[in-house]
Amino acid sequence: MRLSLLILRQSRAKKEVTFSSVLVLVRLPEHSGLGEIITMFRHLRNLQQVSRRTLSSTARRQLENKVPVKQKMFQEDNGMPVHLKGGTTDALLYRATMALTVFGCGYVLYALIDAALPKKKA
Amino acid sequence: MAHQAHAYHMVDPSPWPLTGAIAALLMTSGLAIWFHFHSTTLMTLGLILLLLTMYQWWRDIIREGTFQGHHTPPVQKGLRYGMILFITSEVFFFLGFFWAFYHSSLAPTPELGGCWPPTGITPLDPFEVPLLNTAVLLASGVTVTWAHHSIMEGERKQAIQSLALTILLGLYFTALQAMEYYEAPFTIADGVYGSTFFVATGFHGLHVIIGSTFLAVCLLRQIQYHFTSEHHFGFEAAAWYWHFVDVVWLFLYVSIYWWGS
């Protein structure tokens, strides 16, 4: 297996989360010559540019400040308590937690009473 | 929507104190059932319930503070008192284990060979991994302070970087300590030396994990724009806790690792 270390440099554009240089460990096919290496390098550069465009646009979307939206949602005068005010997911999670709580209560009572009663050995 | 004529926070009715109490019941009873009947079901159920309770309770606190604006200055003052008192209680928790260590090590019994470390115990070299661990935690104290100043100065990117670095250092400490535990030439069953060593350092390690988790939550919140340069108490609480963890390690290092060898 032939391995080659390529150091790729990119220009740091404004408002993009990019690295100034990227270290890439590449596995080369056996018997690859200089021509193949250059082609592979070109492919990698293209891939980088595409991923950079994709990453930066999604990154910008992900890092948007959603606090004002949340503030509006949680300050809505709908009478809901804070633990259910987020929507359906809140209700599902609450029901699951309460179900486990009730079941757990019953199970612990059973387990402790069973542990407390002497068992006759057959 | 605000109908109150005061600055204090009258919380909405919440189910989490109940679910948390039941979780504690299930965990403790589950521990007893595990010891006597080899079944971990009850204890596992308790742990799941505990995790669910913690997630939802603290999620609600974030909603009340960041999204509903309930954390006014007097409320924040109360939260500060609360965190300080909690950390103080943790200090007393560790004081007990240090008391146990000094009780046994200052006057070693004839059963130990009348010496400390006891006969047959090869202690860890304090100038190897333990010293590295000390450097790691001290460095993390610097990075968390850097994060705090970055938040106060509105330097978003630096705050994220320094907070991430703090967490990485915490994880590095945990990994190193786990490796030390695996490689140690003595175990928890090796008399009072083993007991005091692993219980004290073990509880400390647990607190490092808790502190790292707290900081990780703060990192997520910082990324999501929850903190402002004036109001970021969640982060401050995490930073106080982290400094406490650091100081406990320093005492552990000097007492158990260094003097105790």
UniProtKB/Swiss-Prot annotation, chain B:
Mitochondrial matrix side: 1-15, 67-72, 153-155, 224-232
Disulfide bonds: none
Protein name: Cytochrome c oxidase subunit 3
Subunit structure comment from the entry: Component of the cytochrome c oxidase (complex IV, CIV), a multisubunit enzyme composed of 14 subunits. The complex is composed of a catalytic core of 3 subunits MT-CO1, MT-CO2 and MT-CO3, encoded in the mitochondrial DNA, and 11 supernumerary subunits COX4I, COX5A, COX5B, COX6A, COX6B, COX6C, COX7A, COX7B, COX7C, COX8 and NDUFA4, which are encoded in the nuclear genome.
Pfam family, one: COX3
Listed transmembrane segments: 16-34, 41-66, 73-105, 129-152, 156-183, 191-223, 233-256
Topology relative to the membrane: Multi-pass membrane protein
Subcellular location: Mitochondrion inner membrane
Its job: Component of the cytochrome c oxidase, the last enzyme in the mitochondrial electron transport chain which drives oxidative phosphorylation. The respiratory chain contains 3 multisubunit complexes succinate dehydrogenase (complex II, CII), ubiquinol-cytochrome c oxidoreductase (cytochrome b-c1 complex, complex III, CIII) and cytochrome c oxidase (complex IV, CIV), that cooperate to transfer electrons derived from NADH and succinate to molecular oxygen, creating an electrochemical gradient over the inner membrane that drives transmembrane transport and the ATP synthase.
Keyword terms: Membrane, Mitochondrion, Mitochondrion inner membrane, Translocase, Transmembrane, Transmembrane helix
Family membership: Belongs to the cytochrome c oxidase subunit 3 family.
